[in-house]
């Protein structure tokens, strides 16, 4: 599963997920992408489950890019512990995603297979998603 190798601080504040994603909102590497439509925390386990679902459906000859990384630690206090006595220990890692962010990109497969693979992956994620194609920009 994805997790940072080393962090400057073990614990992090909760934060807010206001606004939309400006960075990472276009398909940059592959031909097809899976775009998020609502803000959420996506855990490392959910990312891995979606990755496995995509790779099982797409088979060999495809390339998958994971465009998000879980870099935020989420802490939990032990069960039946009274309030106070400090913040709990880090339990798992999440990626903070805002609407418009591309989660996965895929190339080397047909559009139908990519659509089906992303549909399977979206069932593993706690957010509404949309299938997008690469837009060729003329600069």
From Swiss-Prot:
<dbReference type="GO" id="GO:0019843">
    <property type="term" value="F:rRNA binding"/>
</dbReference>
<comment type="similarity">
    <text>Belongs to the universal ribosomal protein uL16 family.</text>
</comment>
<dbReference type="GO" id="GO:0006412">
    <property type="term" value="P:translation"/>
</dbReference>
<keyword id="KW-0694">RNA-binding</keyword>
<keyword id="KW-0689">Ribosomal protein</keyword>
<dbReference type="GO" id="GO:0022625">
    <property type="term" value="C:cytosolic large ribosomal subunit"/>
</dbReference>
<keyword id="KW-0687">Ribonucleoprotein</keyword>
<dbReference type="InterPro" id="IPR036920">
    <property type="entry name" value="Ribosomal_uL16_sf"/>
</dbReference>
<protein>
    <recommendedName>
        <fullName>Large ribosomal subunit protein uL16</fullName>
    </recommendedName>
</protein>
<dbReference type="InterPro" id="IPR020798">
    <property type="entry name" value="Ribosomal_uL16_CS"/>
</dbReference>
<keyword id="KW-0699">rRNA-binding</keyword>
<dbReference type="GO" id="GO:0000049">
    <property type="term" value="F:tRNA binding"/>
</dbReference>
<dbReference type="InterPro" id="IPR000114">
    <property type="entry name" value="Ribosomal_uL16_bact-type"/>
</dbReference>
<dbReference type="InterPro" id="IPR016180">
    <property type="entry name" value="Ribosomal_uL16_dom"/>
</dbReference>
<dbReference type="InterPro" id="IPR047873">
    <property type="entry name" value="Ribosomal_uL16"/>
</dbReference>
<comment type="function">
    <text>Binds 23S rRNA and is also seen to make contacts with the A and possibly P site tRNAs.</text>
</comment>
<keyword id="KW-0820">tRNA-binding</keyword>
<dbReference type="GO" id="GO:0003735">
    <property type="term" value="F:structural constituent of ribosome"/>
</dbReference>
<dbReference type="Pfam" id="PF00252">
    <property type="entry name" value="Ribosomal_L16"/>
</dbReference>
<comment type="subunit">
    <text>Part of the 50S ribosomal subunit.</text>
</comment>
């Amino acid at each position: 599963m994805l997790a940072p190798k080393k962090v400057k601080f073990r614990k992090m504040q909760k934060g807010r997920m206001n606004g939309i994603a400006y960075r990472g909102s276009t398909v940059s590497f592959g031909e097809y992408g899976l775009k998020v439509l609502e803000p959420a925390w996506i855990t490392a386990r959910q990312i891995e489950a979606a990755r496995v679902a995509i790779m099982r459906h797409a088979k060999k000859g495809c390339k998958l890019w994971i465009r998000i990384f879980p870099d935020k630690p989420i802490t939990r206090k032990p069960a039946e512990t009274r309030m106070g006595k400090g913040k709990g220990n880090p339990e798992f890692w999440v990626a903070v995603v805002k609407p418009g962010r591309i989660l996965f990109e895929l190339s080397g497969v047909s559009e139908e297979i990519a659509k089906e693979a992303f549909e399977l992956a979206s069932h593993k994620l706690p957010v509404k998603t949309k299938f997008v194609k690469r837009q060729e920009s003329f600069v």
